[in-house]
Structure formats: structure tokens, C-alpha cells
A protein has these predicted regions:
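C-terminal portion of ABC ATPase nucleotide-binding domains
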Residues: 180-183, 188, 197-202, 255, ...
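Catalytic Walker B motif of ABC-type/P-loop ATPase nucleotide-binding domains
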Residues: 236-240
Length: 331
């Protein structure tokens, strides 16, 4: 079309109309070509990811057998732990050493990038130790079969995993528990009330869409907490589970942790410091190392301490200090 207008000095009306009609069609073809090229790029990225997944090393399935009741106490002993995301990458956790006593409630705090979530991954062997060890009830988890370890340690991640199906199937996918246990768990986390009956939104036969798209973020977290309560693990890890939920759901989770979760070792990686202000101990991470450890009251007495600084910057300083000093906030 451009060549036609440039080479022909005098252009009558019919020829001009003919050229313009082709110009309109050309723009449609160019638009179609660009959209196909963009789709090709997306497909190429998807194919590249699939190839990467096929080349990943499979996790080892071997390991020593453990007693059926393991862990029976919930003691966690971390010794000189060093962890990285790859053999050629710098460590994200270095020389970590601490012991969690059975039934103890411990909060893990620190600034972004301190290594808090990496610790939870190491406890489940999603990241293998470069050096050092983690023992649960005296057994080195590096020697335990992954299925045994991950099926017996409860975890509630920041991004909850909810499958499609009924509430019953989400709470008990293998059908190992009675309906009464499932109903008790839903009631304990506040998702089910006595007046809801069998037709409530969280009755056992209620439908959950894939990914929990028919639930709020807070409801998904509460459902995951109920699932953990059903299995009654001796160790429960919460990885910033209240970071992105509404205040009402946060209050329900805190009430459950304080009034219902008993007899298990509770490890909470905290986004809101009020979540762990009245816990037995606090472990403060910075740069992948333990920089402070003790009761909340002890850490608040450290001048220019990391935990004290986090409390002062939190915007909830008054509430947190009231909880630390025993003035329980009504939930």
C-alpha cells in the first residue's frame, strides 16, 4: 500500500479506495500475527518449565523404619544446622543450635530474609542439611523416610492448600477418622456452629471448589487448622499463617492456639508479633543465625535488641507488651 502511494503520483478515487481496503485488512493480519507470536512465547515458556521438571532429581524414598507412635513427645533438637537452596549457593541458615522441649510453644521471628521459612522447610526436609542435624524424639530426620516424616509433622503454610471435594474429604482425605472427630475440629476453629446443622456452609457434605475459590483466605486457613487438629500431630508448624488474613479469622486462630492446641510442640513463624507475644520462648533469626533466644519478657529487657526493635516497629507495641507481662487480651 505504501509503495502504491509513493510510486503513483496521481491517484484516482477508485484506486485509492482499493489501496485503503487492503490497508485495513493488513492491520488485521498484523494483529493476528502478533497475538500468535505472543502465544508462541507463552507456550515455549511452559515447555521449558516442563523440561526442567523432568530433569529434577527425585527425592529419596528410602530410610529407616520408625515406631508407629513416633513422634510421641515432640522434642526437636537442632544442632549446628547449615542449609542452602543449592550446592553452589550461599547458606540461608548457618550454625543453628537450639532445642524445643515437648509441648513447648515457640515463636520464630526476624526481618524479611532472616531464614524463618527456610527453617520450616528444613524441618520437613524440603531442604536437606548441608551440615549439622535435626533430631525429633532422638531420631535423625535425615535417616527417616520422607513419607513418615511429612505425614507425622503438621504444617499450616502461609498459602493454604485446599483440594476440591467435600469438607469431609478435605479434612480427612484417607477416611481415617469418624465424622464426630471432623465436626469437633470444625467447631474448635469456629467454622461450624451448633445452629448450622447439616446444611451449613461448612457441613461435612458441603462442596469446596478446587483451590478453595469459594472460600476467603481466612476460611481456608481455618480449614487447614481444622485438618491439622484432626490428625493430632505432636509437632505443629505454622509458617506465617496469619500474614494475609482478616482480623476475625486471625482472632479465631489465636483462640484455637491458646485454648485447643494442647500437648503438641507448637512452632509458629510469626508475621504479627501479637501471635507469639505470650509464647514460652522466642527465637530471633537474623541473616540465617540465631541472634536472640529466650522468653518474650527476657528479650524485651535487651537494650537495642532485635526483638525489642521489632515490637516497637510493629504498631502493636502496647498490646504486645500487655500480653508479655501477663495482661491477656480477650480474644
Amino acid at each position: 500500500v505504501t509503495i502504491t502511494f509513493v510510486t503513483i503520483r496521481t491517484l484516482d478515487a477508485p484506486l485509492a479506495g482499493f489501496a485503503l481496503s487492503f490497508a485495513l485488512e493488513l492491520s488485521d493480519h498484523i494483529s493476528w500475527l502478533l497475538s500468535k507470536y505472543a502465544k508462541l512465547e507463552l507456550d515455549a515458556n511452559a515447555a521449558e518449565r516442563i523440561v526442567e521438571y523432568t530433569q529434577l532429581d527425585q527425592e529419596p524414598q528410602s530410610g529407616i523404619p520408625v515406631p508407629v507412635y513416633w513422634p510421641s513427645n515432640g522434642e526437636i533438637e537442632v544442632t549446628d544446622l547449615c542449609v542452602s537452596y543449592g550446592p553452589d549457593l550461599p547458606p540461608v541458615l548457618s550454625d543453628l543450635t537450639f532445642t524445643l522441649r515437648p509441648g513447648e510453644r515457640v515463636g520464630i521471628v526476624g526481618r524479611t530474609g532472616a531464614g524463618k521459612s527456610s527453617l520450616s522447610l528444613a524441618l520437613l526436609r524440603c531442604l536437606d542439611a548441608r551440615s549439622g542435624s535435626i533430631h525429633i524424639d532422638g531420631i535423625d530426620i535425615a535417616q527417616v523416610r520422607l513419607h513418615d516424616l511429612r505425614s507425622r509433622v503438621g504444617i499450616i503454610p502461609q498459602d493454604p492448600v485446599v483440594f476440591a471435594g467435600t469438607v469431609r474429604e478435605v479434612l480427612d482425605p484417607f477416611g481415617q477418622h469418624d465424622d464426630s472427630e471432623l465436626l469437633d475440629a470444625l467447631t474448635e476453629v469456629g467454622l461450624l456452629r451448633s445452629e448450622d446443622g447439616a446444611s451449613g456452609p461448612f457441613s461435612l457434605d458441603a462442596t469446596i471448589i478446587e483451590g478453595g475459590r469459594n472460600l476467603s483466605q481466612g476460611q481456608k486457613q481455618l480449614l487447614c487448622l481444622a485438618r491439622a487438629l484432626v490428625s493430632r500431630p505432636k509437632i505443629l508448624i505454622m509458617d506465617e499463617a496469619t500474614a494475609s488474613i482478616d482480623m476475625e479469622s486471625d482472632i479465631r486462630i489465636q483462640r484455637t492456639l491458646r485454648q485447643v492446641v494442647r500437648g503438641c510442640t507448637l512452632l509458629v513463624i510469626a508475621h504479627r508479633l501479637s501471635t507469639i507475644a505470650d509464647f514460652d520462648r522466642i527465637i530471633v533469626l537474623d541473616g540465617g543465625r540465631v541472634v536472640e533466644m529466650g522468653t518474650p519478657g527476657e528479650l524485651m529487657t535487651i537494650e537495642k535488641g532485635v526483638f525489642r526493635g521489632l515490637v516497637q516497629e510493629s504498631g502493636e507495641s502496647v498490646v504486645i507488651q500487655q500480653m508479655i507481662h501477663g495482661n491477656t487480651i480477650e480474644l
